[in-house]
Amino acid sequence: MSEPYLVFISHAGTDTWVAQQIEAHIRGTGAQTFLDEAHIGIGEDFEEAILTALERANELVVLLTPWALKRPYIWTEIGAAWMRRIPIVSVLHGLTAEELHTRAGVPVLLKRRDMITVNDLPRYFAQLQKRVQQHRSQ
């Protein structure tokens, strides 16, 4: 039997409640999730837990908000997913794709991908559910 399909959820601490809502819906598709405050215990090696989860992840969901763009860990997690060549699902909240595309310092690797808004998440969840089912049947 293969490992469970794992979705790593990257977000800024300010966006924790929104990230938790996304996590609940992702779990509803049958995927497992990694959300730092839910899966890293007090006193645990934070960076080691993140690295381990990113090594196992099948895809990355990154919640992009104006304040998330200022968080170094967001960019580190995106870079790790990019290096592993796993899907990077950019979820926009509080900014538009146009604002992100024109913002200085945003890497082309994000600009080249389709992005969705939080209002488009049901479409993503439906696609994710299909990927999870395909993964289980392998």
PLM region descriptions:
Residues 66-86, 98-102:
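Conserved TIR/SEFIR loop-to-helix hotspot centered on a Trp-containing motif
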Residues 1-63, 82-86, 92-97, 123-138:
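Conserved N-terminal substructure of TIR/SEFIR domains
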